[in-house]
UniProtKB/Swiss-Prot annotation:
<dbReference type="GO" id="GO:0005829">
    <property type="term" value="C:cytosol"/>
</dbReference>
<protein>
    <recommendedName>
        <fullName>Translation initiation factor IF-1</fullName>
    </recommendedName>
</protein>
<dbReference type="GO" id="GO:0003743">
    <property type="term" value="F:translation initiation factor activity"/>
</dbReference>
<feature type="domain" description="S1-like">
    <location>
        <begin position="1"/>
        <end position="70"/>
    </location>
</feature>
<keyword id="KW-0963">Cytoplasm</keyword>
<keyword id="KW-0699">rRNA-binding</keyword>
<keyword id="KW-0694">RNA-binding</keyword>
<keyword id="KW-0648">Protein biosynthesis</keyword>
<dbReference type="InterPro" id="IPR006196">
    <property type="entry name" value="RNA-binding_domain_S1_IF1"/>
</dbReference>
<dbReference type="GO" id="GO:0043022">
    <property type="term" value="F:ribosome binding"/>
</dbReference>
<dbReference type="InterPro" id="IPR004368">
    <property type="entry name" value="TIF_IF1"/>
</dbReference>
<dbReference type="InterPro" id="IPR012340">
    <property type="entry name" value="NA-bd_OB-fold"/>
</dbReference>
<comment type="subunit">
    <text>Component of the 30S ribosomal translation pre-initiation complex which assembles on the 30S ribosome in the order IF-2 and IF-3, IF-1 and N-formylmethionyl-tRNA(fMet); mRNA recruitment can occur at any time during PIC assembly.</text>
</comment>
<comment type="function">
    <text>One of the essential components for the initiation of protein synthesis. Stabilizes the binding of IF-2 and IF-3 on the 30S subunit to which N-formylmethionyl-tRNA(fMet) subsequently binds. Helps modulate mRNA selection, yielding the 30S pre-initiation complex (PIC). Upon addition of the 50S ribosomal subunit IF-1, IF-2 and IF-3 are released leaving the mature 70S translation initiation complex.</text>
</comment>
<keyword id="KW-0396">Initiation factor</keyword>
<dbReference type="GO" id="GO:0019843">
    <property type="term" value="F:rRNA binding"/>
</dbReference>
<comment type="similarity">
    <text>Belongs to the IF-1 family.</text>
</comment>
Amino acid sequence: MKETNLSIKGVVKEIIKGDKFKVLLENNLLIEAHVSGKIRMHKIRILPGDSVEVEFSPYDLTKGRIIYRH
């Protein structure tokens, strides 16, 4: 059975080593996130200050995956 993932909007604060980012979420939590495969495949650039949507597993809310750049 597949668990539903949570998603929330945030702002990229800094780039960490390649495809990892520090993202400040709407609820003022600073988390580490990586880019999804489709963003990587389409070579979408994500820079500090970009507004993004981050998806989480319900099991680990400290790490996420960037699924959309606004």
